[in-house]
Amino acid sequence: IQLLPVNDTTSTHTKADSYPYAAISAFALHPLYISLEAVAGTTHKKLISKIIAHKKELNQAEGVCYEEVMKYKLEALKLLFDVQHKDLFEQADYINFYQQNKSWLQPYAVFSYLRDTYKTADVSQWEDFQFFSQSIIEKLSSPQSKSYPKIAFYYFIQYHLHLQLKQAHEYANKKGIVLKGDIAIGVNKHGVDTWMDPTLYHLDMQAGAPPDDFAIKGQNWGF
């Protein structure tokens, strides 16, 4: 089974983010794919019952209600984060995941927090935070910081996405099915990777393809 890129593309919190190749992170998975029921388990199933009920309405729509799906999933995840994260963050499996992925996870979570705070992924609009530094990351993500809960929220999401994709991969393997992942050859101009080290990218250029029979005007892939 070949998959389109499953990286997070959340840049504007609008339908424009549905383009799967405009990754804001080369590592982070997209919250769109998370199973709320799996995160809630039987213990917290009632907590998100109203949101899950709305899922049936969304599934009956003729097309994908991208913005609405994202809105309701994030609302449900915030409810679950509030009641689960303290215990989860003390578990050995989570601690191992965090330590092994800290190099990208921490900057990604801070980027997501700043994107939400300034309501834009354009880092040039982030005032004192437009230029990346490790000191900024450490300051904002400190457990003593006021911003910590909103940043840790993204740790929580990525950990559960990791568990769920791992489980799906293992299940597919048992059934003799190979998952073939499509990976974009570039990233979103307004993303955590370009924020961390803009010198690695040609930010004044975009990838694409010249005119051919498939696209007579050529293609601009937007990354």
What are these model-derived regions, one by one?
Residues 1-198:
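Acidic/aromatic-lined carbohydrate-recognition and catalytic surfaces
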Residues 192-223:
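Active-site-adjacent "gating/activation" loops or surface patches in catalytic cores
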